[in-house]
């Protein structure tokens, strides 16, 4: 269905409909269309939620937008390869009704950003560039979450038991139930399991030993110590501030034991396990932790009178988790995994306090990009914020402008934080730009890159 519309002083033609699998789609073409189409997995929801200003800005700047809504059965049938197929159907419809765009930019956040990366690598014949905001990569993210949650289970379960809350078995991290306790989006749970983990975190935080151990688990998982909204960014030189922030962050994560949307990721391959640690030495992961976190953890351990190496051995001594080869075969296909080999330019943004997707994943992909000699096709930028996908209209506009300059000239403009903030501010969206240098947040190497032969 096509209809003219005016929204926030932008006149555009809108088309909405349903794809054969029941997913909704939307197309908006402004009167001043510049010939460029921005395609987004989450356009339908994005135009009506707190991110709507991003899409309003695109229309004001002359970009057409087209995309889908996530399928209502996604929690049980997640398949990014199929989502890409749907986006191609939307592009077919756009071309039939509005003509072929001069350029197509794949754009998306979270699962939509994974799609952006995957499209750039394996389905690039219909796009010219990709912008990926807060991208996950399924096996990578579930392994990173497994490392932190496994360490938490190993190190602080005793506080839960000693406080009389129940047995250690209450603190599950894998093989989670499809019993309705997970929200329909696949993100977040209700009920006994998250409540048990909150009790465990509260009990551990009441002691110097527990605070030190929670910080160690975050370091082993390569998780940011700053994940809770409305909390101050911790001074990386202040161990107690880091411990405070780790506790608040753990409480934020408690709604998704085992890792954000683990049930959805496990359901995708018929409930089979996609993460593992049966071949992991957590002593190696400790050595590879963020240096500031290592320093803070060591000081917290010294203050608590604990033996750090003994606790790492405690983690190493626990029964391990094996992946299902069926699940790994499912995820090791085009569209479902990425290997750092894009065919078109990619700009990747991430917030350092993203609670759903550890920012450390960016380093893993960047390293693969370099291994494959693709540095000229790739740039990254980081944003000083907690939350997830709450990039401002200014930050989004800057990302698109950078991509447009790369496509127009064949050269990347500067992606230094000050320059990105200047581009963002020039967009006059009335929103804040928070691009930042990592400066102390770097990791030596990402632990969980998955690039099967």
From Swiss-Prot:
Catalysed conversion reaction: a phtalamide + H2O = phthalate + a primary amine
GO molecular function: phthalyl amidase activity
Gene3D superfamilies associated with the record: alpha/beta hydrolase
Top EC class of this enzyme: hydrolase
Biological source species: Xanthobacter agilis
Regulation: Inhibited by iodoacetate, p-hydroxymercuric benzoate and copper ions.
Taxonomic classification: Bacteria, Pseudomonadati, Pseudomonadota, Alphaproteobacteria, Hyphomicrobiales
Identification of the protein by name: o-phthalyl amidase
Biotechnology: The broad substrate acceptance, high catalytic activity, and stability at high salt or substrate concentration of the enzyme indicates that it can serve as a gentle method for deprotecting phthalimido and o-phthalyl protected amides in new chemo-enzymatic synthetic routes.
Keywords: Hydrolase
Keyword flag Transmembrane: no
pH influence on activity: Optimum pH is 7.8-8.4.
Dependence of activity on temperature: Optimum temperature is 28-34 degrees Celsius.
InterPro entries named among the record's database cross-references: AB_hydrolase_fold, DUF6351
Function: Catalyzes the removal of the phthalyl group from phthalyl amides generating phthalate and an amine. The enzyme has a broad substrate specificity and hydrolyzes phthalylated amino acids, peptides, beta-lactams, aromatic and aliphatic amines; substitutions allowed on the phthalyl group include 6-F, 6-NH(2), 3-OH, and a nitrogen in the aromatic ring ortho to the carboxy group attached to the amine.
PTM text: The N-terminus is blocked.
Enzyme Commission code: 3.5.1.79
A family per Pfam: DUF6351
Domain of life: Bacteria
Subunit structure: Monomer.
């Amino acid at each position: 269905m096509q209809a003219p519309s005016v929204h926030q002083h932008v006149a555009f033609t809108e088309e909405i409909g349903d794809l054969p699998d029941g997913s909704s789609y939307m197309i908006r073409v402004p009167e001043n269309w510049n010939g460029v189409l921005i395609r987004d997995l989450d356009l339908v929801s994005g135009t009506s939620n707190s991110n709507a200003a991003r899409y309003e800005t695109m229309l004001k700047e002359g970009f057409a937008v087209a995309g889908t809504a996530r399928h209502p059965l996604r929690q049980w049938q997640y398949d990014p390869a199929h989502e890409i197929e749907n986006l191609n159907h939307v592009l077919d419809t756009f071309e039939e009704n509005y003509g072929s765009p001069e350029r197509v930019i794949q754009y998306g956040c979270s699962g939509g950003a994974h799609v952006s990366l995957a499209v750039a690598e394996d389905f690039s014949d219909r796009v010219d560039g990709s912008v990926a905001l807060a991208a996950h990569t399924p096996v990578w993210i579930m392994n990173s979450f497994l490392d932190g949650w496994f360490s938490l289970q190993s190190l602080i379960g005793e506080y839960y038991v000693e406080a009389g809350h129940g047995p250690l078995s209450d603190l599950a991290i894998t093989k989670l139930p499809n019993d309705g306790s997970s929200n329909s989006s696949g993100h977040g749970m209700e009920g006994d399991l998250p409540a048990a983990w909150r009790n465990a975190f509260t009990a551990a935080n009441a002691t110097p030993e527990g605070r030190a151990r929670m910080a160690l688990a975050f370091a082993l998982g390569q998780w940011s110590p700053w994940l809770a909204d409305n909390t101050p960014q911790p001074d990386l030189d202040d161990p107690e501030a880091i411990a405070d922030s780790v506790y608040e962050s753990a409480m934020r994560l408690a709604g998704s034991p085992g890792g954000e949307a683990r049930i959805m990721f496990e359901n995708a391959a018929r409930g089979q396990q996609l993460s593992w640690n049966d071949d992991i030495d957590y002593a190696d992961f400790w050595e590879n932790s963020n240096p500031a976190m290592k320093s803070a953890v060591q000081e917290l351990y010294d203050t608590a009178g604990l033996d750090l190496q003994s606790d790492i051995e405690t983690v190493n001594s626990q029964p391990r988790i094996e992946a299902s080869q069926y699940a790994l075969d499912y995820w090791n296909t085009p569209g479902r995994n990425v290997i750092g080999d894009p065919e078109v330019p990619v700009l990747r943004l991430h917030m350092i306090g993203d609670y759903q997707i550890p920012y450390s994943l960016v380093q893993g992909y960047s390293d693969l990009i370099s291994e494959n000699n693709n540095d000229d096709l790739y740039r990254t930028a980081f944003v000083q914020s907690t939350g997830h996908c709450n990039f401002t209209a200014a930050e989004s506009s800057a990302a698109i402008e950078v991509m447009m300059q790369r496509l127009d000239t064949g050269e990347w403009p500067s992606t230094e934080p000050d320059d990105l903030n200047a581009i963002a501010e020039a967009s006059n969206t009335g929103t804040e730009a928070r691009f930042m240098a990592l400066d102390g947040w770097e990791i030596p190497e990402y632990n969980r890159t998955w690039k099967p032969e």
